[in-house]
Amino acid sequence: MGAAGVLIGQGFDAHRFAPAGSGRELWIAGLYWPVPDSCSEADAARYEGIEGDSDGDVAAHALIDALLAAARLGDIGSLFGVGADAHGAGRHGIDMLQEVVAHLASNGYTPASASVAIIGNRPKIGTRRAEAEAALSAAVGCPVSVTATTTDHMGFTGRGEGIAAIANALVEKI
C-alpha cells in the first residue's frame, strides 16, 4: 500500500447489443437511454438494449471492477456471480455499484476518485455526460468523470456490434 493509503484499480467491461426486437432497455452509466421521439424506425435500432445477465451497463460494471480491484476484493463475477441464476441477474448496474461501495466500507475502504471511458459509436454519450457523471458520482460517493470515444469503425465497437468501458478508481483505507 502507498504511503498515503491510497490504492488504484482498473476495470473493463464489454457487451454486445441485443438483437432488434429483444425488448432490452439501453442502460449506460446508470441512465436509461430511450429512443428519441424524432428517431426514424431504422435509427431506433441504435437504442436497442445490451445483452447481459443484468442490465449490461458497461460503465457501471467497469467501475465496479475498478473499485473491487483497488481494494483487492475480487471482481464483479466473484461478488455477484455469473449466469441467469447469479445474484446480479436482472439487476441494474447502478444498484450493484451501490452494493459494492457498501462492501468496500465494510472492509475498511472508501472511494476517493474515479473515471470511466465509454467506447462505442452509440449512443452519443456527450449529450448526457453531466447526467452520467452525476449518477455515477452519487452512487459511488466521490467524483466520477465520464469520457467517451469511438474506435474509428475498428473492432466490434466500431462495427456497432457492442459497447465497452474502461474505468480507473482510487480508494482509500479508512
UniProtKB/Swiss-Prot annotation:
Origin, by domain of life? Bacteria
Alphabetically, which GO biological process terms does the record hold?
isopentenyl diphosphate biosynthetic process, methylerythritol 4-phosphate pathway; terpenoid biosynthetic process
Class of the enzyme per the UniProt entry, highest EC level: lyase
Q: Name one GO molecular function term.
A: 2-C-methyl-D-erythritol 2,4-cyclodiphosphate synthase activity
Question: How is the cofactor bound here?
Answer: Binds 1 divalent metal cation per subunit.
State its cofactor: a divalent metal cation
In what pathway does it function? Isoprenoid biosynthesis; isopentenyl diphosphate biosynthesis via DXP pathway; isopentenyl diphosphate from 1-deoxy-D-xylulose 5-phosphate: step 4/6
Q: Where is this site: Transition state stabilizer?
A: D53, T150
Q: Where along the chain is 4-CDP-2-C-methyl-D-erythritol 2-phosphate bound?
A: D13, A14, H15, D75, I76, G77, T149, T150, T151, D152, F156, R159
What's the family? Belongs to the IspF family.
Record's function text: Involved in the biosynthesis of isopentenyl diphosphate (IPP) and dimethylallyl diphosphate (DMAPP), two major building blocks of isoprenoid compounds. Catalyzes the conversion of 4-diphosphocytidyl-2-C-methyl-D-erythritol 2-phosphate (CDP-ME2P) to 2-C-methyl-D-erythritol 2,4-cyclodiphosphate (ME-CPP) with a corresponding release of cytidine 5-monophosphate (CMP).
Q: How does it assemble?
A: Homotrimer.
Protein's UniProt name = 2-C-methyl-D-erythritol 2,4-cyclodiphosphate synthase
| Species of origin | Bifidobacterium longum subsp. infantis (strain ATCC 15697 / DSM 20088 / JCM 1222 / NCTC 11817 / S12)
Q: Which gene encodes it?
A: ispF
